[in-house]
Amino acid sequence: QAFGAGNFRECTNMLARAIAVALLLGLLILTLQYPLGEAALWAMNGSQMTRDYYYTRIWAVPAGILLFGLNGWYNGMQNAVIPMCTAVTVNIVHMSCSLWFAFRMDMGIVGIAYGSVIAQWTGVALSVVLLRIFYRKKITRIDWREVVDLKPLRAFFAVNRDIILRTLCIVAVYTFFTGASARMDDPAMLAVNTLLLELFTLFSYMNDGFAYAAEALTGRFIGARDERSLRDCLRKCILWGMVVSVVFVGLYVGWWRELVGIFVEPDAPNAAAIVALAGRYIGWIIAIPLAGAMPFIMDGIMVGATHSRIMRNSMFCSTAAYFAIYYGLYGWIGNNALWLAFTLYMFLR
């Protein structure tokens, strides 16, 4: 919104807030790494290898949080290229360093952790360098009194709070989905549901792109008070989201066996049985893109408009409905209750 209004002073303040909060949160996690780590290791009965990995990998956490803040700021500035370049660089460095340390240096899983740390901090360094190259003239001098001013700071934390609560609901739904699948009488049901959920994940990645576009452009046009462009942008984002949904429905109808086969080891003794069992529930995967086209885009619109409370409340209601539908119908229709609950959860969002 500040970008749309041409208020680069507030853009600078937002960047400073994001970096300051990321650094403070990262330092807090590093400070508490021992009690947090020991509690988690005790709860999961972690091995020495897990302990070594954790105490190495934890040093990448501040960099990861910083990258979230920097990438969010770039998206708000209508620049998706720098986050993409950063993500590609992080992945290349991560793979290269992990392979080098784990196999060439014979460091095992700790080597992979070192690869993660180096990759994340490389991403931060690249992001900061690109920030200085491309935004040096637009970034104003930081006035820390404005940065810590309570009114914009409250709004900043309110949006972050609502996004975190939304994310916790999503994690609860997906975690419960996996747990409920594992508790079913048929042990193959966990494999089938996981495979089918991967097909939904492919669709969600595509629609996430329109959600990010809606988020950035909604903020821009609201800040510029350009209602006509805002309406046009929202119509196009929704239209393309629906087009992607229809394309995926066609893809799932015509090639669901081939898509499921990608995730099934062909030589596995029960491969044919898993594919056949997946076919009994493929109708839900065909229905979900139609029910789930709008939630991603509407989340982007609400975040861009800073109406995150609406997004949070809709998530609370749909999550409650998800659990109510599952527990109300599981005794009658079994695994179909889980998929019906998930489909209606997406639709209600």
Where are the predicted features?
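Small-residue-rich hydrophobic transmembrane alpha-helices
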Residues: 1-31, 67-83, 192-253, 292-306, ...
